[in-house]
Amino acid sequence: MTREEAKKRIERLRELIEYHNYRYYVLDSPEISDEEYDKLYRELVTLEKQFPEFITPDSPTQRVGAPPAKEFATVTHEVPMLSLDNAFTEDEIKAFDQRVRSALNQQHVEYFCEHKLDGLAVSLLYENGLFVRGSTRGNGYVGEDVTANLKTIKTIPLRLKGENIPPVVEIRGEAFMMLRDFEALNEQRQALGQPLFANPRNAAAGSIRQLDSSITAQRKLYFMPYGFGLVQGMDFETQERFLKQCQEWGFRINEHNRKASSIEEALEFIRYWTEHRVELPFPADGVVIKVNNLRYWDILGTTAHAPRYAIAYKFPAEEKETKLKDVVFQVGRTGIITPVAMLEPVVLDGATVSRATLHNFDIVRQLDVRKGDVVKLKRAGMVIPEIIGVAAEKRTGKEEQIEPPTTCPVCGGPTEWDGAYLKCVNITCPAQLKGHLLHWASRDAMDIDGLGESIIENLVDMGLVKNIADLYKLSVQDLLTLPRLAQRSATKLYENIQRSKDRPFFRVLYGLGIPRVGLKTAQMLAEHFGSINALLNATMDELTSIEGIGTDTAETILKALQSPQVHELIDQLKTLGLKMEQESIEGPLKGLTFVFTGTLTSMSRGDAAKLVQSLGGKVASSVSKNVDYVVVGEDPGSKLDKAQKLGLTIIDEEAFLKMVKREHNG
């Protein structure tokens, strides 16, 4: 084949593959078999290897995933990706309509109704029709660059179809997993001994936030647009027209979307799908109602965190009944023994549920729940399955009381009561160690990708790891002794463990699992004391001087820090090279200290603190003369009074957002 013939064949293969991708993933109407498709794809791969000069960014082969990234770059949203205000009743929807009509001085307003997909909000930037960047929503102002991962999603066109294409358009929508694919993924993970995803949203978010996009490529993800950000050279006029244009460009559109000539028609849409949501193939937790006329959007405007032209109605939590077959006892990293109900599998809000926590033995007594009972189940916040009651009228007399274990169900050691909680007091209990290791490897702590529950189980059971520090002493050869871990996976896990040594001090502190030290408290302690040595020498007065740390918490922290085992572990981690001092990040806010008070509307105070820290600034927990800016939200506390007395610079949320956006953009 000549070079010119190869070029023509490559172009034709791309056209064919993208056409069949569109038929399969967008229209759900394939014209060829999987085998025929694979044959075309393999031919394209072969030709592009022979003639790499003809590879283009929009080639179907570029979906398979880029080399693993060390971390995600940040992306500033030129048009903020705002969240939506929620409504839980029809009256709240009617009140929204009243506000809209009053602001527009209109008797009737046309709306557009869409399902609120339950996945991960992402943004796709196209320049002259070519997909050039994809990012997560993040805090609405700054997200993460996940372009390589989003390229693997077949319902995201790498190049827009048709001729009506603006120079720049930013498409926003939801990346999600179909319910059938979520079930299949969890079945596969269960067979491999991997931890299961709690729901399709977590599965989608976890897949897109993979540093290795080849993993994302293995997951069956979909994308549907719902809005736009930056647009140049085009006016869509209505939400309905915008989505129609997206369809013409090659995106998959929800066929159930409907235009409503009045709020009553919108309510009919809500009522129908509240009753029929189980028929949907994708996860949806509500309905979004938007003013259809885009000209009205500018008139209605936005608040700091949500548009005034749209509202999200949240479906009420679904309840189901099922049989409680048995109760098992789990031991957590702090030794608390939790009763867990094993259930006859039941589909609840689109996910199969076969177990639910009973929290503690006080709850067991209050519910009077017994083995063999028919129990009432719902998903708290659409995430955690929770038993809310018992169908006592369905009892047969064969039900059995649930008795607390007299010894630890894992190590057989002694137990003791701590209020409503039963605890194993054996500090060498393998279950506690496994819990500590899981916590250490978690995203908010050391974020060790690949160190999941099944690997930790094997590391502990095989005696390879007896404390957290032992993780950093493992070799690739040690990891190769684990079941089902091949050379490539073992090498990658080893590298991920070693790479975690670079995590900042506050995450090490959080990862230690000190009782009552959550992520926020760990950040405050790291900021206040600056090093592990200073913290180990802290006094009660020093701890309680930090806002949010009371006497009980301070006593618990001091007691934990005085433990010989904690001292020994910290010494080992120091020797192994983990960070035990707070580092200052280079950035435009370096040298500036911020304090937040009151409720922020655009993001949580935690997200605001992360934003400041990512730009090199510091966040203090209390007001002092060393503070440069006090950011005031709604209902500020005593910090505002103190700041005024000290004559500090006080700014509102809007000024803060302008400041960080300006600094982030340089």
UniProtKB/Swiss-Prot annotation:
It is an enzyme of class 6 (ligase). Its cofactor is Mg(2+); Mn(2+). Keywords: DNA damage, DNA repair, DNA replication, Ligase, Magnesium, Manganese, Metal-binding, NAD, Zinc. It catalyses: NAD(+) + (deoxyribonucleotide)n-3'-hydroxyl + 5'-phospho-(deoxyribonucleotide)m = (deoxyribonucleotide)n+m + AMP + beta-nicotinamide D-nucleotide. GO terms for molecular function: DNA binding; DNA ligase (NAD+) activity; metal ion binding. The active site is at K116. It comes from the Bacteria. The keyword Magnesium applies. Residues 584-666 form the BRCT domain. Pfam families: BRCT (PF00533), DNA_ligase_aden (PF01653), DNA_ligase_OB (PF03120), HHH_2 (PF12826), HHH_5 (PF14520), Nlig-Ia (PF22745). Zn(2+) binds at C408, C411, C424, C429. The keyword NAD applies. GO terms for biological process: DNA repair; DNA replication. NAD(+) binds at D34, E35, E36, Y37, D38, S83, L84, E114, R137, E174, K290, K314. GO terms for cellular component: cytosol. Its EC number is 6.5.1.2. DNA ligase that catalyzes the formation of phosphodiester linkages between 5'-phosphoryl and 3'-hydroxyl groups in double-stranded DNA using NAD as a coenzyme and as the energy source for the reaction. It is essential for DNA replication and repair of damaged DNA. Belongs to the NAD-dependent DNA ligase family. LigA subfamily. This is DNA ligase. It comes from Coprothermobacter proteolyticus (strain ATCC 35245 / DSM 5265 / OCM 4 / BT).
